[in-house]
Amino acid sequence: MIKVIERDGKVRLPFSRGILTRSITSVGVDVDLAYAIATEVQEELIRQGKKVVTKEEIRNITYQKLVEKGFKEEAKRYLFWRRFRKLKIPLIILLGGPTGVGKSTIATELAFRLGIRSVIGTDTIREVMRKIITPELLPTIHTSTFLAWKELRGTVTGSPIIAGFESQVNAVAVGVNAVIQRAIKEGLNAIIEGIHLVPGFIKIDYEMAFMYMIVARSREELEARFYERTRYSKRSAQYYISHLDEIMEIQEYLIKKAREYRVPIIENVELEKTISTIMEDIMEKTVEIMKKKGLDMLEEPK
């Protein structure tokens, strides 16, 4: 049995092809091929007569195997994410976007690939606030975002739909900002997703916090997503489709805010493409941040 240790030799765990396969698939390699590469890495260690091996040695052999098979970009990403994990820097990913666009699915997949345990939906934060704050005190949080305008009091300037939405966002953002600050303070990785993540309302004063606006390419595409959603949701597709005008108006507002605050806008057409776009963007920005600190995250192993 091959044992894996840290540099200080304190931790000894059995080598796992499954864990290595997951690491390789996280950079976009098909699972069958990733398992084959993990097997080759294990065979290489056996051939070298290794009984004890460091994580760095495994990383270097895996990198070479990826390069040999023509996966140069994947090898680069693999190297980056392994090194980034080692730095133990808290990573905060924020995924905003309208109802039904696929934010939860994206968040779950990102969490799996990056090994992030904490995935928080802003709907959950809103639900907690509903238990604390009565409808009489703050009525707009006690309904759907696209119906919050019906609970507004007084005169409204501009679109009532957006005014109601902003009222709910303004309240929920307090909880969201508290969650972000706690994650940073505790040194925890976190992915937060939800319609309430609106640029300008969410405080992002941490260099390793990355925000993305996920949107639907068209009204028809979003409508199709609602029908797909009925497979695991108690609410019928018709509930959302009957309010599609309001939802699309909110999407246009979110796009406008994202452009204003230079938040990347991603049309969620294919899950794999969306995930790759986000991970690639985080990598590129992190490489630049670390370069300013004298660290080369993409230096090839010797």
From Swiss-Prot:
Cofactor: a divalent metal cation
Pfam family, one: ATP-cone
Family: Belongs to the 2-phosphoglycerate kinase family.
Gene that encodes the chain: pgk2
Residues that span the membrane, as ranges: none
Coiled-coil regions, chain positions: none
Protein's job: Catalyzes the phosphorylation of 2-phosphoglycerate to 2,3-diphosphoglycerate. Involved in the biosynthesis of cyclic 2,3-bisphosphoglycerate, a thermoprotectant.
Domain of life: Archaea
GO MF term (any one): phosphotransferase activity, carboxyl group as acceptor
Matches recorded under SUPFAM superfamilies: P-loop containing nucleoside triphosphate hydrolases
HAMAP family documented for this protein: 2PGK (MF_00769)
Pathway(s) it belongs to: Thermoadapter biosynthesis; cyclic 2,3-diphosphoglycerate biosynthesis; cyclic 2,3-diphosphoglycerate from 2-phospho-D-glycerate: step 1/2
Ranges where the ATP-cone domain occurs: 2-89
EC number: 2.7.2.16
Enzyme class: transferase
Catalytic activity of the protein: (2R)-2-phosphoglycerate + ATP = (2R)-2,3-bisphosphoglycerate + ADP + H(+)
Keywords in alphabetical order: ATP-binding, Kinase, Nucleotide-binding, Transferase
Matches recorded under InterPro entries: 2PKG (IPR020872), ATP-cone_dom (IPR005144), P-loop_NTPase (IPR027417)
Protein's recorded name: 2-phosphoglycerate kinase
